[in-house]
A protein has these predicted regions:
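Cap/lid and interdomain-hinge subdomains that line or gate substrate/regulatory clefts
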Residues: 1-3, 25-29, 63-74, 78-190, ...
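Conserved, well-ordered active-site substructure
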Residues: 320, 331-377
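C-terminal structural cap/anchor segments
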Residues: 278, 282-326
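Glycine-rich, highly charged phosphate/nucleotide-binding loops
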Residues: 51-65, 306
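Short acidic, glycine/serine/threonine-rich loops at helix termini
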Residues: 15-17, 85-88, 113-121, 182-187, ...
Length: 385
């Protein structure tokens, strides 16, 4: 069995979509399932949304289970722009699993995300000049790899694949194109912890002689009633909500006051009543961040929790067949609130956008995507029309 440890639920779902592409049966869970029958076990730790201390505690627990499972391949799925506690988690995993070497390959060249001369570039421009600088939880203030990882002197080396590789320590890969990914995939060995973004994981699968399945492109058949949760503060997300509302998709905005640490149960109740009415009338509804809401770290946590409460309330009042969520921390909060701890990918709708079956509920499917990714085009996504 192969195992991927993801620090975020949408990252786990993205790997699940790749598993489908390569004909692998995948299971997404929050713990090490020693009895899993899957080809690929994907463990969502949700550590990106935790404090570093809490994240390390989760990693310790996961590594204990991994020692018993003994996977044939272990890959740590990280955020491609290195948000979260990436270095601290990798250093701890090295210690616990007794792996002297680690390789971090964050680049996704297919999405314009590259590492050149120790600098992270997005479509050729320094990362900190992009919308990632406005991330409420992990704002990007620098494009330097060492600064992004908060690395101290001697913690890491940033190297191209053709440079001599050290016998111990952590290497961050310079990558300009897919050929560089292929070259890095040939440097793996049993003493090396491998971490990276989705594109590198796909490259590793191909290095293992796996090939993408040839499938016909088809529209996603999604069944109402459907709830879409737009909890990401990214400008693309806000623009998307505005566009679908203009196109006639029912949108229920969270009252701005609920973005604060408000305990106004009456206001929450009124919002839910209005949302349920839209769902009943239209068969679908999106709950979204109010345009006037702040998107700093404190508000992000409140918004995430409110979105999860709203999802649980709506699911308790209506039978939902589809829940579509953007943003990994929001998705994880919703899953916890709904008591969901195991998912099985069934359809990759677009890069990073994966539809999954919920264990124990044949009627319900979850579709997840990272906040910085795009939803599929409307003509491939009939629910959005």
């Amino acid at each position: 069995m192969m195992v991927v440890i993801a620090d975020d639920l949408t990252g786990a779902a993205e790997i699940g979509g790749l598993a489908l592409k390569y004909g692998l049966m995948a299971e997404i869970t929050t713990t090490v399932n020693l009895h899993s029958k899957a080809d690929l076990l994907i463990i969502d730790t949700d550590t990106r949304s935790l404090s570093q201390t809490a994240a390390k505690a989760v990693i310790r627990e996961i590594c204990t289970g991994l020692k018993e499972l003994q996977p044939t391949l272990l890959f740590k799925k990280i955020d491609s722009v290195l948000r979260g506690h990436v270095l601290a988690e990798i250093q701890l995993q090295q210690e616990l699993l007794q792996l002297p070497k680690a390789l971090i390959v964050p680049a996704n060249p297919g999405l314009g995300r590259t590492v050149v001369n120790s600098t992270y570039l997005l479509n050729g421009q320094p990362l900190h000049q992009s919308s990632f600088s406005q991330d409420p939880e992990f704002p990007v203030y620098s494009s330097g790899i060492r600064e992004l990882l908060q690395a101290k002197d001697g913690d890491i080396q940033v190297l191209p694949h053709y440079a001599p590789q050290p016998g111990a320590g952590i290497v961050v890969a310079e990558v300009q194109n897919s050929s560089d990914l292929v070259a890095w995939s040939k440097t793996l060995d049993a003493d090396k912890l491998v971490a990276g973004a989705a594109e590198f994981f796909a490259t590793i699968l191909e290095a293992m002689n796996m090939r993408p399945l040839v499938t016909k492109e088809s529209s996603a058949i999604l069944h109402p009633p459907a709830l879409m949760i737009c909890g990401s503060a990214f400008h693309k997300s806000r623009a998307f909500v505005k566009k679908i509302e203009q196109d006639g998709f029912p949108v229920s905005y969270m009252p701005a006051a609920l973005g604060d640490a408000s305990t106004d149960t009456q206001l929450f109740q009124l919002w839910m009543e209005a949302t349920l009415l839209q769902l009943k009338q239209e068969g679908k509804v999106s709950i979204a961040i109010h345009p006037q809401m702040e998107d700093d770290k404190a508000h992000a946590l409140n918004i995430r929790n409110r979105m999860a409460e709203a999802a649980a309330f709506i699911a308790g009042q209506a039978t939902l067949h589809e829940i579509l969520i953007e943003g990994g921390s929001t998705a994880a909060a919703v899953m916890r609130k709904l008591g969901i701890d195991r998912l099985y990918p069934t359809m990759a709708l677009a890069p990073g956008v994966t539809r999954m079956r919920v264990q124990g509920n044949k009627e319900l499917h979850l579709t997840l995507k990272p906040g910085s990714y795009e939803w599929p085009p409307l003509d491939l996504f009939p629910l959005m029309q």
